[in-house]
């Protein structure tokens, strides 16, 4: 979900201390030459588990994984801090899961979002003005968590981009959701025009990051800007309507908690037991917020139905 999160996307560097280490580079080169050519490559493929082949793990990937741990062991033996590799901490692979804890947390976030989607559909009549917009937001959110799960399962150039792009789509769609709720019901033409602008903005954002080298700094700055707009808009509306709609505390609490929990990312410590890091903790901590946010969406939709129903009742003089 994370519709208000400013720090939803953190830029990563393309190179880190670990993968710049000559020991690591030499290890990968030797491993590649000795194991990833000719009959040895055939032996590797014959011994490689099916689930590893299906998820795209290559001989070179296996060399990098083994050399990463070889380098880490040397660092620890000599009393140095654990280094990062390619912008990430070293994680202990489980089956084909590259980052098991983050993958599990992303999956659970997706399940929570999907369950709340079903609950919203079962408790809110389709005649509600915000019904389709809320369902669309829910599906965008589920899709984002799906790609987050895939990315943490197997980090490739494609899965990384899909994770970033889908996360951006959640923030932008949350802005549209807020626009619909604050202006769109009274002025549909404004909401339609703004929605078209957001689609164009999203297309330009993706094009810039896809056509050239992926600009992590721009990506972080752009999504931070999207997040600030989203955050301030929702908070302003909640503060303005707080005396008329008492359930808005749920929306405010989600906003505040998401921003507070994002601070976990700043801890950035080596994974505990080589599995659980700050990023995974952040993802785990957002799971309960789905229930609170969708409770707000349900209450707000039912409130709109009640207001419209009361307006339709003829007044007796």
UniProtKB/Swiss-Prot annotation:
UniProtKB keywords: Glycoprotein, Golgi apparatus, GPI-anchor biosynthesis, Hydrolase, Membrane, Signal, Transmembrane, Transmembrane helix
Side of membrane Cytoplasmic, spans: 115-132, 181-189, 241-251, 294-317
InterPro entries registered for this protein in UniProt: Per1-like (IPR007217)
Signal peptide: 1-18
Pfam families: Per1
This protein's record includes keyword Chloroplast: no
Entry's EC annotation: 3.1.1.-
Molecular functions per Gene Ontology: hydrolase activity, acting on ester bonds
Bridged cysteine pairs (disulfide): none
Subcellular location field: Golgi apparatus membrane
Residues passing through the membrane, by range: 94-114, 133-153, 164-180, 190-210, 220-240, 252-272, 274-293
Domain of life from the UniProt record: Eukaryota
Glycan-modified residues: 35
Cellular component annotations (GO), alphabetically ordered: endoplasmic reticulum membrane; Golgi membrane
Lumenal side: 19-93, 154-163, 211-219, 273
Membrane topology of this protein: Multi-pass membrane protein
Name the record gives this protein: GPI-specific phospholipase A2-like PGAP3
Organism field: Xenopus laevis (African clawed frog)
Gene name, Swiss-Prot/TrEMBL: pgap3
């Amino acid at each position: 979900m994370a519709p208000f999160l400013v720090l939803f996307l953190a830029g990563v560097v393309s190179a880190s201390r670990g993968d710049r280490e000559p020991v690591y580079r030499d290890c990968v080169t030797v491993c590649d030459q000795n194991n990833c050519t000719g009959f040895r490559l055939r032996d590797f493929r014959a011994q490689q588990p099916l689930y590893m082949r299906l998820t795209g793990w290559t001989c070179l990937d296996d060399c990098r994984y083994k050399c990463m741990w070889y380098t880490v062991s040397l660092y620890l033996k000599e009393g140095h801090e654990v280094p990062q590799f390619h912008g990430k901490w070293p994680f202990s692979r489980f089956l084909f899961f590259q980052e098991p804890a983050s993958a599990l947390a992303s999956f659970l976030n997706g399940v929570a979002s999907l369950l709340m989607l079903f609950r919203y559909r079962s408790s809110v009549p389709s005649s509600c003005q915000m019904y389709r917009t809320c369902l669309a937001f829910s599906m965008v959110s589920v899709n984002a968590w799906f790609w987050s799960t895939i990315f943490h399962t197997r980090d490739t150039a494609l899965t990384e981009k899909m994770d970033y792009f889908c996360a951006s789509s959640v923030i932008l769609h949350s802005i549209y959701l807020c626009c619909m709720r604050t202006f769109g019901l009274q002025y549909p033409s404004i909401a339609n025009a703004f929605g078209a602008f957001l689609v164009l903005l999203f297309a330009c954002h993706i094009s810039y990051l896809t056509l050239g080298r992926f600009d992590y700094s721009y990506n972080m700055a752009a999504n931070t800007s999207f997040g600030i707009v989203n955050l301030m808009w929702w908070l302003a509306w909640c503060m303005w309507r707080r005396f008329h709609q008492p359930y808005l505390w749920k929306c405010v609490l989600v906003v505040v908690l998401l921003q507070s929990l994002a601070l976990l990312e700043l801890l950035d410590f080596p994974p505990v037991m080589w599995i659980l890091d700050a990023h995974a903790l952040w993802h785990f901590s957002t799971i309960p917020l789905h229930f609170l946010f969708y409770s707000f969406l349900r209450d707000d939709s039912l409130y709109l139905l009640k207001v419209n129903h009361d307006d339709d009742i003829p007044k007796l003089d």
